[in-house]
Swiss-Prot record:
Record's function text: Thiolesterase that catalyzes the hydrolysis of S-D-lactoyl-glutathione to form glutathione and D-lactic acid.
GN (gene name): gloB
Family label: Belongs to the metallo-beta-lactamase superfamily. Glyoxalase II family.
Organism annotation: Nitrobacter winogradskyi (strain ATCC 25391 / DSM 10237 / CIP 104748 / NCIMB 11846 / Nb-255)
Alphabetical list of Gene3D superfamilies matching this protein: Ribonuclease Z/Hydroxyacylglutathione hydrolase-like
The protein's name: Hydroxyacylglutathione hydrolase
An individual GO BP term: methylglyoxal catabolic process to D-lactate via S-lactoyl-glutathione
Cofactor: Zn(2+)
Amino acid sequence: MTADIRLFTCLTDNFGVLIHDPATGATAAIDAPEAEPVIQALDREGWVLTDILITHHHSDHVGGVAELKRKYACRVVAPHDRSAEIANVDLRVGQGDIIKVGTLLGRVLETPGHTLDHVSYVFDDEKVVFAADTLFSIGCGRVFEGTYPMMWDSLLKLRALPDSFRLYCGHEYTDSNIKFALTIEPNNPVLKARAEEVTRLRAEGRPTVPTLMGEEKKANVFLRADDPAVAAGVHMKGASGVEVFAELRERKNKS
């Protein structure tokens, strides 16, 4: 049976996400920015939290873990990098590990760059990836702890996922990401269509996530830094993908 997924807002612009296995009743939160919105989402559905799958140690992704752990006695899964302080962890995971949420199987991808400990969770049967702050809709995370080559390698891992996979990310940044991307590729038809869609969704008060990996591969300039069209957009014809990516990220940091 297909998993049920619920998306909701936490803090100011964070997304909270629940993935639920109807066969067993198991429910996992992908990160826990704060506890109350997670509790409210669970109560609306009549679900009980069994797991928290942490992507990285930033406070806006783990701020609700302690309270949720106390309330539900749920299992807390976190990246294996112990240099990042994350409290209440029951299980540490790394590249290729499989996490069971009831009958649902989540595969761990190490996607460092934004932070050194960052992981993404891929549920292949459900055709969904939870990429948190590595890959955003039409964007990517800032490189705080890693290097540009490290982040580019992480994006390539995510780009290898099938086009049909849905992407859930950690923040509602799509509008600003599109405005930046249009400065690089003002004539990209997929990007322009996405811009119109995002304007409509935001006007209706609806989230711009999830998006499809196939769409990201056509419109996300960070994910396409090795595309000659993107290189031309930053006047770096012939440069490597990682060189173009670094230039894009530097420009976005200043925008």
